[in-house]
Each structure stands twice: as structure tokens, then as C-alpha cells.
From Swiss-Prot:
Top enzyme category: isomerase
Alphabetical list of PANTHER family matching this protein: ATP-DEPENDENT DNA HELICASE HOMOLOG RECG, CHLOROPLASTIC
Protein name, as recorded: ATP-dependent DNA helicase RecG
CDD domains for the chain: DEXHc_RecG (cd17992), RecG_wedge_OBF (cd04488), SF2_C_RecG (cd18811)
Residue ranges the record marks as coiled coil: none
Domain of life: Bacteria
Chain sites annotated for binding ATP: 296-303
Alphabetical list of Pfam families matching this protein: DEAD, Helicase_C, RecG_dom3_C, RecG_wedge
Residues of the Helicase ATP-binding domain: 283-448
GO biological process: DNA recombination; DNA repair
UniProt xrefs under SUPFAM superfamilies: Nucleic acid-binding proteins (SSF50249), P-loop containing nucleoside triphosphate hydrolases (SSF52540)
Keywords annotated in UniProt: ATP-binding, DNA damage, DNA recombination, DNA repair, DNA-binding, Helicase, Hydrolase, Isomerase, Nucleotide-binding
Length: 693
């Protein structure tokens, strides 16, 4: 193996890696030894010295050593094994809920045990629940760790101990195999070498300050952060350069349909809408594909902007596809577009994952023949069996739910006769500038920074759950006396559609009992699309007074008569999501209210979050605060997409570096194309195939 580059050495060449483990590691994108070395610890534990048991404080993670005094199994509400150890300074109780006979036998009275875990204050003094422990041999001195212990991001079935053993082998290979130095010499001068940085971060010596690692300031981290941010920026430059090599259908001015639609509208577009439409039309007139992100706050009128862009393509006899993240939102878009386009003689088609059989086949045929000019749906519209007929524009609503890879896959799908479609991406989640510079560097950006006239700002209050009855009375008053409608949103911390649906059903039953004079509807993610649509339609038509819902109504639902929103457990959601939910009210001229019904006690972070919402209705201000409180991954929807997910860099912490990184990335892109390509391959392997398009 000597002399090989580590990106060419598969993990299967390491001891202990068989087919089953290989498959599990592949789930976290670990395929080669280089991947493993770049899979860096999330945090570190200090197991390099012993704590006297008598000095343990609650909440401290510590290593202790003691002699087993007793070990007992009890059978109460659940089986439990407790083992007490003493080091002379105090007694520690170790508690285990998952255990076996071998564990019980190993913890015999008189044995010496080394244990690591979080100290808690228990009924009988200090205790640890499920500590990691090791029975000591006859050595008089305990075998302590020589370096800080790394804790890695992992996946089901891969233990920390496994990752540590594999990383030990990978670090040994650094002596015989090379990990290629990709930074040009003028950039890497005076910096730690890559092998040095990797050794330091995987096995930090006990002398190293943990605070440096926690703040991302250690030279080893700075070395890798620079490389990763460069790779990210280089991939965006490659995407842009790639896009410039593609051909798109140039769609010149042809305004007859647009003018007809504008004349039929009961309102005039805002100045911001008109400006953004002009920017889009300028892009679409070129023979390279448009790649434009339109940011607009909740209720700023992005749908009309999308419709006007679509008409430019339809006027040239081309097709337009609009993709939304949920069936509910896609269906609402389809209804909106039908209302606007039917009088113009334009047929709007609708495709969703749940469509089956003949209906789906008929829709696919209508798309393939070109009979349907505007296609609306979820990601189902980009499945293999859907064939377009001259697709010239792709509109993606709510970008964060898709991510860069899906965005690029759409391009490939849309390519026909050598032409790529223009792309328009719309998001109602305003993105702070630093974040947009990195995460969306491949896109041009337009901002709709003006709300339509006649919108009244929503008043937001935070009220503890103990006053639930008062809030129910407030709902009764709004619906019966004021003739308004209301939303009651249930949120759950677990990302489980089933549990969320059950919580919503329980709340629905409770509110039907408490408010017998109201018609109360229910909508959640586990209902069939047709059922959801039926409930939403009756709410929109005013047949229901109150709608109990999960966060499925977060985006796009438009009922101007709804003026009151209750959000339960708002402390469980991020600011951007709360702002989205709140945006479902305040869509008419009447004063609207949002009640954040929280459970006490509130954490400090939750207090700050709710205060931000009470103070501001501006999505951009809220997004900046959200970034400061939560960090970029959550803000960009990393949970769903993997977009903007960094191994060492942190866009919030490292934002000061971004302008300089962009300058360096341009330098490498122009002067060192081979290194640029290799850096992207190293840090962002999934993006590589698009960069070469």
C-alpha cells in the first residue's frame, strides 16, 4: 500500500471492515481512508485524568476509579442494575437499564473499575446513568487515555469505539501513504501541514486547550476550515462556469399574455414585483440558462412573479414546470395558476406522488404531447416516466427543502435537444447575506422587499400554557363575535408524522368539546391529499371557523379572513418556521394576532427566540437573528437536504473569512484548475459530476 494516495485506499482494506460495516459507513458517506480522516469529531471528552468521586459536580463529564462495593438487580416499573463503587473520597452509584449477566458478573465486589460518564445528583449522592466502564486488571495505576477522546458523528449500528479504532488505523497509514496537499504553496505557507492538522484534530494531546477547539480557533481547524470553504466556493464557481457552457432557449419579449393577466388582476403589482420580473425577463432573453433565486418575505407576492415568468415561456410555445415541497402547497399553486391561466386558454396540469393509474397516465400523456403548458407538482414531476415537450423554465418553490443536488438533477432532467431550462428558485425564508454568499453563490439573487398595500402587521404575544382557557375564549370571540377564522397549530419535537398527527387529533377533540358552537376542522401530514384539500377548501370558503393543523400549513396557505393564529409549544421551532406559520394570518386588511402558547419553564434561548418574534415582522431581521441563535445548518434546512453541510467550517462562526475565501477561490479557479477540481472532489464528492457538465 506504500506510496498510494489515501483517497484511493478503500475502507475495506482496514482491519475489521467487512461488507456489513462498509454498507453502514457508506450511509455517512465514508468510502475511502481519506473520507474517514476528513470525518472529524463533533466534540471531545477529557478522559486523561481521574476525578475524586467526592469532588464530582452535577453535569460534569468525568473519569473516576473505584472499588465495587455491591451490584444489585431490582425489578420495579423497569429492570435496573445498580452498582456502587468507592475511591475513599466518596461513593458513586452506576445505574444500568440495559444489561446482561456477563456485565453483572464482571462487576463483582472488590473489583476495580474505571468509569466515564456524566455525574448527576441521585437519591443516595453522586450517580452516573449508563457510564462507559472498564474493569481494571491487577495494575496499581489505572490505564487512562493519553489524548482527548473524540466523539464522532455516527449512524445506527456504528459505535464510537469502532470509529476510533478505524481512525487509529487511518492515522497510522498517514506515515506510509500520502494525503495530497492541494493548496497552492503561496496559500499554505506558514500553515500546519494537512497530516499534522488531521492528527491533532483526531487525537488532541491533553495539553491542548479544549476552549480553542470549541471555538474553532485552533490552527489545525483553521487549516481545514480554509480548505473546506475554498472547496465549497470552488464548486459554486464550477457550477456557474458549467452553466455558462450550457445553451438555453432565448425567450425574447412577447407580452400579450402577460398584459392580459395584468389587466384581469384586481390589483396592481408592487414596484418590487415589477423590478424582479424585469430582472427575470432580462435573464430569460439570454441563450444561457437563468439561475436566479427570488427571496421574498411571507406574503410579498412571489406567486405572481412566478406566473409572469411562466407566461414569457408559454408565449413562445414552451412548457413550464413548477415544483413545490408538499402536495398541499403544490395543489394550491395549481389552483392559483388555473384561476389566472384558464381565461388565457392555457392548460395547467398537476402531478403528485399519490396520483395512480389512469389519471396519472393521462396527465403524463398530456405533458408529453405538449397539450399541458404549465405543470405543477411535487418532485414527482421529475421522475423518469415524465417526458416534457419543450421544457424551457423550471420554477422551484421553497428552495431549502430541496438542496443543491436536487436542483442540479432537475437541470439534467430538463435538458432536451441540447437546451437546458432556465431556473427560477423562490424562497419565503429570507437568507442573511453572509449565508447567501456561500450557500447560493451559484445563483443570481432578486429580493421582493415590499409588501402589497393594505396588509396589516400581525401583533404577536407570548402566553404560558397555564392560560389555555383564556386563549380558547379568545378563539370563540374571534370566530363568533368578530366573524373571523383561526388556526391552532400543534408542534412536536419528534420528527414523527404519526405522533404529530396523534397530538393534532387530541387537540382537535379537546377544542371540539370546549367550543361546541364552532365548526372545527383538522389537517395533518398523514391524511390523504384529497382529504387535506377538502378540509382546506371548506376553511377557505368559510365553512369552518377553526382549523387545527400540524406544521403542514407552514407555507403558502392563503385565507384572508383568518386573523388569529395559536401556535402551541413554539419553543420547539426555529424562528424562520415560526415566522412562516405566522404568515398564514395578516393576509387581509383586518388586524391579526399570533399567540405563542408556550410551556413553562422556558430556556434562555427560547425566551430570546420568542422575544425576536414579538419585536419584528421583518423576515430578513428574523433570519439574521435565527442564524445567530441556531447557526446556518438548520437555517438552510440541512436536516432535509445536506446542502451547506460542513465538516469543519461553520458559516456563522467563520463568516469573517468568507470575502477573503471568495477572492482566493477565484485565484485557484483561474490559476490552478486541477487543484480546484481535486479540492471539490475531496470535500464535496456529490457535487463533482455536475461541475464537469
Amino acid at each position: 500500500m506504500k506510496g498510494r494516495l489515501l483517497d484511493a485506499v478503500p475502507l475495506s482494506s482496514l482491519t475489521g471492515v467487512g461488507a456489513a460495516l462498509s454498507n453502514k459507513l457508506a450511509k455517512i458517506n465514508l468510502h475511502t481512508v481519506q473520507d474517514l480522516l476528513l470525518h472529524l469529531p463533533l466534540r471531545y471528552e477529557d478522559r486523561t485524568h481521574l476525578y475524586p468521586i467526592g469532588e464530582l459536580l452535577p453535569g460534569v463529564y468525568a473519569t473516576v476509579e473505584g472499588e465495587v462495593l455491591n451490584c444489585n438487580i431490582s425489578f420495579g416499573s423497569r429492570r435496573m442494575m445498580t452498582c456502587q463503587i468507592s475511591d475513599g473520597s466518596g461513593i458513586l452509584t452506576m445505574r444500568f437499564f440495559n444489561f446482561n449477566a456477563a456485565m453483572k458478573n464482571s462487576l463483582a465486589t472488590g473489583r476495580r473499575v474505571l468509569a466515564y460518564g456524566e455525574a448527576k445528583r441521585g437519591k443516595y449522592g453522586a450517580e452516573m446513568i449508563h457510564p462507559e466502564y472498564r474493569v481494571q486488571g491487577d495494575l496499581s495505576t489505572p490505564e487512562l487515555q493519553e489524548t482527548l477522546t473524540p466523539v464522532y458523528p455516527t449512524t445506527e449500528g456504528v459505535k464510537q469505539a469502532t470509529l476510533r479504532k478505524l481512525t487509529d488505523q487511518a492515522l497510522d497509514l498517514l506515515d506510509t501513504c500520502a494525503i495530497e496537499e492541494l493548496l497552492p504553496p503561496e496559500l499554505s505557507q506558514g500553515m500546519m501541514t494537512l497530516p499534522e492538522a488531521l492528527r491533532t484534530l483526531h487525537r488532541p494531546p491533553p495539553t491542548l486547550q479544549l476552549s480553542d477547539l470549541e471555538t474553532g480557533q485552533h490552527p489545525a481547524q483553521r487549516r481545514l476550515i480554509l480548505e473546506e470553504l475554498l472547496a465549497h466556493n470552488l464548486s459554486m464557481l464550477a457550477l456557474r462556469a458549467g452553466a455558462q457552457r450550457f445553451h438555453a432557449q432565448p425567450l425574447s419579449a412577447n407580452d400579450a399574455l402577460k398584459n392580459k393577466l395584468l389587466a384581469a388582476l384586481p390589483f396592481k403589482p408592487t414596484g418590487a414585483q415589477a423590478r424582479v420580473v424585469a430582472e427575470i425577463e432580462r435573464d430569460m432573453a439570454l441563450d444561457v440558462p437563468m439561475m436566479r433565486l427570488v427571496q421574498g418575505d411571507v406574503g410579498s407576492g412571489k406567486t405572481l412573479v412566478a406566473a409572469l415568468a411562466a407566461l414569457r415561456a408559454v408565449a413562445h410555445g414552451k412548457q413550464v414546470a413548477l415544483m413545490a415541497p408538499t402536495e398541499l402547497l403544490a395543489e394550491q399553486h395549481a389552483n392559483n395558476f388555473r384561476n389566472w391561466f384558464a381565461p388565457l386558454g392555457i392548460e395547467v396540469g398537476w402531478l403528485a406522488g399519490k396520483q395512480k393509474g389512469k389519471a396519472r397516465l393521462a396527465q403524463q400523456e398530456a405533458i408529453a404531447s405538449g397539450q399541458v403548458q404549465m405543470i405543477v407538482g411535487t418532485h414527482a414531476i421529475f421522475q423518469e416516466q415524465v417526458q416534457f415537450n419543450g421544457l424551457a423554465l423550471v420554477i422551484i418553490d421553497e428552495q431549502h427543502r430541496f438542496g443543491v443536488h436536487q436542483r442540479l438533477a432537475l437541470w439534467e432532467k430538463g435538458q432536451q435537444q441540447g437546451f437546458h431550462p432556465h431556473q427560477l428558485i423562490m424562497t419565503a425564508t429570507p437568507i442573511p447575506r453572509t449565508l447567501a454568499m456561500t450557500a447560493y453563490a451559484d445563483l443570481d439573487t432578486s429580493v421582493i422587499d415590499e409588501l402589497p398595500p393594505g396588509r396589516t402587521p400581525v401583533t404577536t404575544v407570548a402566553i404560558p400554557d397555564t392560560r389555555r382557557i383564556d386563549i380558547i375564549d379568545r378563539v370563540r370571540h374571534a370566530c363568533m363575535t368578530e366573524g373571523r377564522q383561526a388556526y391552532w397549530v400543534c408542534t412536536l419535537i419528534e420528527e414523527s408524522e404519526l405522533l404529530e398527527a396523534q397530538a393534532a387529533e387530541a387537540t382537535w377533540e379537546e377544542l371540539k368539546l370546549a367550543l361546541p358552537e364552532l365548526n372545527v376542522g383538522l389537517v395533518h401530514g398523514r391524511m390523504k391529499p384529497a382529504e387535506k384539500q377538502a378540509v382546506m377548501t371548506s376553511f377557505k370558503q368559510g365553512e369552518l371557523h377553526l382549523l387545527v393543523a400540524t406544521t403542514v400549513i407552514e407555507v403558502g396557505v392563503d385565507v384572508p379572513n383568518a386573523s388569529l393564529m395559536i401556535i402551541e409549544n413554539p419553543e420547539r421551532l426555529g424562528l424562520a418556521q415560526l415566522h412562516q406559520l405566522r404568515g398564514r394570518v395578516g393576509r387581509g386588511a383586518v388586524a391579526s394576532h399570533c399567540v405563542l402558547l408556550y410551556k413553562t419553564p422556558l430556556s434562555k434561548t427560547a425566551q430570546i427566540r420568542l422575544q425576536v418574534l414579538r419585536d419584528s415582522n421583518d423576515g430578513f431581521v428574523i433570519a439574521q437573528k435565527d442564524l445567530e441563535i441556531r447557526g446556518p445548518g438548520e437555517l438552510l434546512g440541512t436536516r432535509q437536504t445536506g446542502n451547506a453541510e460542513f465538516k469543519v467550517a461553520d458559516l456563522l462562526r467563520d463568516q469573517a473569512m468568507i470575502p477573503e475565501v471568495q477572492r482566493l477561490a477565484r485565484h485557484i479557479h483561474e490559476r490552478y484548475p486541477q487543484q480546484a477540481k481535486a479540492l471539490i472532489e475531496r470535500w464535496m464528492p456529490e457535487t463533482e459530476r455536475y461541475s464537469n457538465a
